[in-house]
Design a protein with these regions (language model features):
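Exported/periplasmic ABC-transporter solute-binding proteins
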Residues: 23-71, 78-81, 85-259
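Bacterial N-terminal signal peptides
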Residues: 4-17
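Sec/Tat signal peptide C-region and signal peptidase I cleavage site
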Residues: 18-22
């Protein structure tokens, strides 16, 4: 009898502790291109607050659909406005918490040891000739933000028709980066921040402003979030400390930092 009583008491203590534990944790679903910078920012947040952050990185399209299917996330950071709009339209995020946090740039990369040096990217840019018999690594142009930006730029510059069949499409921008880093493709189109963290690639050209929509990373708390710490986390992302971290990795900080 006493054994059963102690077992029941132990279970009650575990259940009572569960909400408290949840208060000390935040689950973040973030675009793959944010990994290095956000990992560092999250570590600083945890050190300052004691709140554990668990981050999952993937294509924004995949993350939005996972949240829609019930995946437990407190914060969503997309690499474009469309997938955050999708989340808002499906009532997956709290609109009053949404802000455009970061910006980025689109660049052309090659393996570090490639003979290709610099390329002037502009109207009439012949990317197909540059690739030769090789392929061009990009994220999925139909769904993944980095791929959609790449397609928009290539269409604007008149290069899309010549390269569409030569694209090696990847599940996210970091996978496209890896194709070039491993030498599997001679060229790739990624964000400038991705190129900066991979020593096996180099930037050979930058796509001109106006050839693709501004790369924007909106952030919002999810509708189903039950973490009281989520609001503190969102506030931290707007802080001078977070701004310094993101800018160190090459992101543009789009909002005024809040101390």
């Amino acid at each position: 009898m006493f054994a059963r009583l102690f077992a029941a008491l132990g279970l009650l203590l575990v259940l009572a502790a569960a909400p408290a534990a949840a208060q000390d944790a935040v689950t973040v679903f973030a675009a793959a291109s944010l990994k290095n910078a956000l990992d560092e920012a999250d570590a600083a947040f945890t050190k300052a607050t004691g709140v554990k952050v668990t981050a999952s990185y993937a294509a924004s399209s995949a993350l939005a659909r996972q949240i829609e299917q019930g995946a437990p996330a407190d914060v969503f950071i997309s690499a474009d406005l469309q997938w955050m709009d999708y989340a808002a339209e499906h009532r997956l995020v709290r609109p009053e918490t949404r802000v455009n946090l970061l910006g980025n740039r689109l660049v052309l990369i090659a393996p570090r040891d490639a003979a290709l040096d610099t390329v002037a990217i502009g109207q009439g840019f012949d990317l197909a000739r540059l690739a030769g018999d090789g392929r061009i690594a990009v994220a999925d142009v139909a769904a993944v933000p980095a791929g959609k930006y790449a397609k928009a730029a290539l269409e604007k510059l008149g290069a899309w028709a010549g390269v569409e069949a030569k694209l090696a499409q990847a599940e996210n921008v970091r996978a496209a980066l890896a194709f070039v880093a491993r030498g599997e493709t001679p060229l790739g189109i990624v964000y400038a921040t991705d190129a900066s963290i991979e020593p096996k690639v180099k930037i050979v050209g930058a796509f001109p402003d106006g050839s693709y929509p501004p790369v924007t990373y909106p952030v919002a708390q999810t509708t189903d979030s039950r973490s009281p710490a989520a609001a503190r986390y969102l506030a931290f992302l707007r802080s001078p400390a977070a701004k310094a971290t993101f800018e160190k990795y090459g992101f543009n900080f789009l909002i005024m930092p809040v101390s």
